[in-house]
Amino acid sequence: MPTINIYKWRLLNELKISETQLEDLLFNLKSEMKPIDQDHIEIEINNDRPDLLFVYGIIRSIKGLLKKELGEPRYSVKDTDYVFEIKEVPSRPYALAAVVEDIKFDDELLKELIQFQEKLHITVGRKRKKIAIGLHDLKKIDSKHIIYTTVNLDYKFIPLNSDKEMSVREILESTPQGKEYGNISLLDGKMPAIMQDDGQILSLPPVINSEKTRINSKTQSLFIDVTGTSLDTVIFTLDVIVTNLAEMGGKIGRIKVISPYVDNSPLLQHKSIKITAEYINKILGTNLNKNEIIEYLKMARFDVNDLGKEIEVIIPPYRNDILSQIDITEEVAITYGYNNLSPTPYKIEKIGSLSDRTKLIRVLRDLSVGGGFTEIFTFTLISESLLLGDFVKILNPITVDYNSVRNSLLPSILIFLSKNQHARMPIRVFEIGDVVIRNENTETGYSNKLNAAYAIMNSRVSFEELQAPLHEILNSLGINPIYKRDTNPLFIEGRTASIYANNKKIGIIGEINPNILEKIDIEYPIVMSEIYLDEIKDIL
């Protein structure tokens, strides 16, 4: 987890608390501190709280715990004359900016601001690959029209910590920042650049700023730019920075943005989550009334609307860790106090045993191996191009080959078979594993289901070659299956059946459609079946 070094007296004086109290309060924020020297402490911050990577973010949260301030802070935001024009930058397409004025720095606070910038680079920014931040002295910018564009490698400016003009190529090849970050956004001999409308470069993201706009302890106004590959992350990062600076008295300035995605920035976006007192009390084992819960949520620095049966919680723009009702419940637990949650003695009156689910898996595994099948284990993630129906898609996949969560075991097994066509035929395999399917009755709208799947691949194979051993396996479980003709785009029409038991559908079986096989470059015919083990468990 990230750590920050801060001047402890700022915290203690602002909050008017002792060092021991500070340690206890930080623990409530899932953070820990240890002394560095007489004036400084190191604080370990939880990964999901980038808003606490700056001293004033910590002060904001602790003021809530101490009830010195309740609800979301109100920040002064005014429109400015600055314009930020976004050109096409293929390697790093998103950029936003803001102005913060009336800031008072000292040497310690300036160090902590630069530390905040670098910690955001490492955590949220994934070492500047996802986002990069530029901090500029606003008074040193000569124009109110700033442009985000690309420049070629011969373009020159004076980089930070230098007194001579250098070309972009020289900066990438000779400076420490250029060597470490230069290749991140270099594309076709061009680099992203933020410049004045007269062509003077202010920043070369994600590498280095210009010496022209260097900040120091006398800086009173900042121009902040954030560039990146994810618009949502760029928006959030800028919101986190400006709200932290506003906590130290800064006035946020809104900038007009010329871009295809936003008209101005910062956006300071809010979202809301509705929750009930019953839900919170059920999770925490408490008996808090609605008014008490509202008070605890305000201590967590949330605004709250009483909707009668429900409570609407307004999530501040700097809290991207609040995703669902369970996160709201955790915030109530923090402000209520974990030490105030009474543990309930749990009496175990019988010895442990295997669950029905585990027993079924073990028996089915033995029967399947006895039926001549080899067990395989495939990835839960798969390409969306191989899935049918409703499925969960990953927001930030590393690769398109694993951008979705499977809703069936069959596509995963087909991928396995496509990579093993060189093996000796026939190939008879099975897999027992979880799939994720649509379920409107759950909080997320999806739920896990346990399935088993079987496949036979050979130079010649038929429906009956799998039906016979599968029938024996199901019979051995105490299931008397009935097969009814059905259709499914994965299988050949007329060679497909749904499997029923006790008037409940428990699976499907069929010969794979040749068009599907051709799509994934399989040269052999395949017959497959998928069994819904949760349905079987209910029958047994």
From Swiss-Prot:
Domain B5 intervals: 268-343
CDD domains for the chain: PheRS_beta_core
Coiled-coil residue spans: none
Main location as per UniProt: cytoplasm
Protein localization: Cytoplasm
Binding residues for Mg(2+): D321, D327, E330, E331
Keyword terms, alphabetized: Aminoacyl-tRNA synthetase, ATP-binding, Cytoplasm, Ligase, Magnesium, Metal-binding, Nucleotide-binding, Protein biosynthesis
Enzyme class: ligase
Key word NAD present: no
Top-level taxon in the UniProt lineage: Archaea
GO molecular function, one term: ATP binding
Co-factor requirement: Mg(2+)
Biological processes annotated in GO: phenylalanyl-tRNA aminoacylation
InterPro entries: aa-tRNA-synth_II/BPL/LPL (IPR045864), B3/B4_tRNA-bd (IPR005146), DNA-bd_dom_put_sf (IPR009061), Phe-tRNA-ligase_IIc_bsu (IPR045060), Phe-tRNA-synth_IIc_bsu_arc_euk (IPR004531), Phe-tRNA_synthase-like_B3/B4 (IPR020825), Phe_tRNA_ligase_beta2_arc (IPR022918), PheRS_beta_core (IPR041616)
SMART domains: B3_4, B5
Gene Ontology terms: cellular component: phenylalanine-tRNA ligase complex
EC number: 6.1.1.20
Catalytic activity: tRNA(Phe) + L-phenylalanine + ATP = L-phenylalanyl-tRNA(Phe) + AMP + diphosphate + H(+)
Database matches in HAMAP family: Phe_tRNA_synth_beta2
Family, per entry: Belongs to the phenylalanyl-tRNA synthetase beta subunit family. Type 2 subfamily.
Binding partners and assembly: Tetramer of two alpha and two beta subunits.
Protein name in UniProt: Phenylalanine--tRNA ligase beta subunit
